[in-house]
Amino acid sequence: MSDASPVSLVCCDVVGAAAADGSVLERAFAEAIATQGVVTGTAAYVRSMVQFDRTRGWSPADVMHSLFPGDEIRAQAASLAFERSFHAAADRFGILPLPGANDALDKLTAAGTKVCLLSCLSRPAFSMIMERLGWWQRADLLLCADDAARGFPWPDLVLTAILRLGIGDVRDVAVITASESGVLSARRAGARLVVGMLSDVHDAARLRRAGATHLLADIGDLPDLVAANGEVPAMPAHRE
């Protein structure tokens, strides 16, 4: 057994790691860039979708600025269009908790572990997700892109959670995320456990390359992993 102190904070990147978005993000992104003339069937559309995949976990505003570098007007217009499309797509396709997510959050809280639910989405988008999931009271802290200077892949959101919740050591933190950029953020923040959630966001190979210390196919296994300070197998091969 390790002499390490127990994990006192779990930061959960909601979309992908704890909730399924039913491709709402991708649909909203495609609709948003279409307002700027980037439409299906064009080379620009293909490049944009590659960039969307590469930047999963980034704030939508940062993604749009990466697509339209030096063109602030188009980047801002696309960001506004994304916000509108995201809400509309969520109405059409829904956002649901992953199986086991509610129980996992309950078990972490019951064990005395602080929980931060976070996302690089804007406050209105994140608030809408919390409302749909009924998770306003599920965590000790809720953070979105508007609460930190930078989103993923930078460490700001995780570090903000650490500061606001009074965690004394970054090594007492676990982060669970489904995106490569989320893993990078957790590593840069110094989290001890960096858990990659196997989903339709990024695959096991990408999460491992980014620095995930563990992989989970079921968020229901997270409380046991945290309780064991990461000293249990959690890198299944069947979801490669």
Residue ranges with predicted function:
Residues A18, P97, V115, V175-I176, ...:
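Conserved SAM-binding loop
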Residues F152-E180:
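Conserved Lys-Pro-Asp/Glu-containing loop-to-beta segment of HAD-superfamily phosphomonoesterases
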Residues D3-P99:
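N-terminal helical cap/lid subdomain that shapes the substrate entry/recognition surface
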Residues N102-T109, I162-L163, V183-R188:
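Surface-exposed amphipathic alpha-helices with a cationic face
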Residues S48-F52, W135-G151:
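A short, structured active-site edge motif that brings together acidic residues
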Residues S5-P6, A88-L117, R123, S127:
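Short, acidic loop-to-helix structural element flanking the phosphoryl-transfer center
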Residues A174-H214:
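Acidic, Mg2+-coordinating phosphoryl-transfer loop and its flanking beta/alpha structural elements
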Residues V39, W136-D140, G168:
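Conserved H-loop
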